[in-house]
Amino acid sequence: MKLVLIDGEHYPDVISWAIKKLGDVCCAVFLGGSEKIGSIGEVERKIGVKVYHSPNYLDALRRALEENKVDEVVDLSDEPVLNYEDRFRIASLCMLYGVSYRGADFHFKPKPLKKTKKPSLAVIGTGKRVGKTAVSGFIARTLKEIAKPVIVTMGRGGPEEPELIEGDKFEITPEFLLKFAESGKHAASDHFEDALTSRVTTIGCRRCGGGMAGFPFFDVVDEGVKLAENLPNDLIILEGSGATFPPYRADRYVVVVGAKQKLDFVRGYFGTFRVSLADIVVVTMADSVGEERWKALRDAILEINPDVDLHFIAFRPRPLGNVSDKRLGLVMTSSEALPKAKKHLEGLGAEVPYTSDNLSKRPLLWRDLEGFRGIDAVAVELKAAAVDVVTRWALEQGIEVIYLDNEPVNIDGKDLRKAVLELGRALLGGRA
């Protein structure tokens, strides 16, 4: 059945004519405008279907979607009642309810979201380089206290067939990763990073393309989830890729937002869809912005999802090896995070004479590595060219490789670890 969006800038006779041409219309939502109508009751009598209305048109649309079996929302409105921002808000709400939304020259159609057979938690982001994998790894480490999680990742460098890494059963060494990379595979994929930093079982999957709302174009996540469901693990963590997420309706959601992202990517477009899904929102790299930005992010997120548990965190480098009394070269992707990471490692007793923020820029990375002289070890995040460039270079030079994790630390007085444990207990105690 169709739900139509209507306004008072169209005469009721015109709306009635359009509804008859559409056919199969169960109800309408009145968006506003009064130039060409009298009362809502008059409109309802003229068009012959129930009309939902509210001072907030999204509340009316939400109620209509919950009370009717709607497959498609059809937009019969226009400027000035609706603008581009309004239409993205409507599209986000339609994605949340799993219904199609189309107008005269646009069509947003959600992919069907499947359910896992085991309790599931999705970790998704509002963009790339927001620290989603670091947050996912932290969640897995935390939930190991009360569960046996398995992480299903999806990535543009992921394997064509789901790849199982039993990170809880063997040590992932630089030599192992390099050998894997030399076989032609991407050894810095998220499932390797999660297995290395959290010592849990992970399953890596491939995806290609990502739509505006976050649905992948092609992926092999179904096969990965089936594999996870046949393992003895009791909780599945579904990890997104960039702003794209696995096509599953998880039981719980953690949404990761970068503090320096454009605010419109959070409160507009399909950011509202992602934030609406969240049980917990983690704003990462919050130490890189001021109070005014904190307030803007808080206001935007809570306006979309008033009940969400909101956390502002900073990342602290967590070396997966001893750095004390060692002379290090430090390699990362973020130029902004680099000075803070250097200072933190020096606080752990390391000397850090050389740094590079070109981990994702291979030609510049090679140049930087050639300047690293007289070091005992290289500390590097497991992403981008960490294995096939940095690890290979270090092992050829006889230099120790120490991989870095990014540990989320609250800077807002709250406790993300406690929140994750509470979410995990609620999830394991009974699925929504």
Swiss-Prot record:
GO terms for cellular component: cytoplasm. The keyword Nucleotide-binding applies. It comes from the Archaea. GO terms for biological process: gluconeogenesis. It is an enzyme of class 6 (ligase). Its EC number is 6.5.1.9. It catalyses: (2R)-2,3-bisphosphoglycerate + ATP + H(+) = cyclic (2R)-2,3-bisphosphoglycerate + ADP + phosphate. InterPro entries: Cyc_diphosphoglycerate_synth, P-loop_NTPase. It is found in: Cytoplasm. Keywords: ATP-binding, Cytoplasm, Ligase, Nucleotide-binding. GO terms for molecular function: ATP binding; cyclic 2,3-diphosphoglycerate synthetase activity; ligase activity. Signal peptide: none annotated. Catalyzes the formation of cyclic 2,3-diphosphoglycerate (cDPG) by formation of an intramolecular phosphoanhydride bond at the expense of ATP. Belongs to the cyclic 2,3-diphosphoglycerate synthetase family. This is Cyclic 2,3-diphosphoglycerate synthetase. The lineage of its organism: Archaea, Methanobacteriati, Methanobacteriota, Thermococci, Thermococcales.
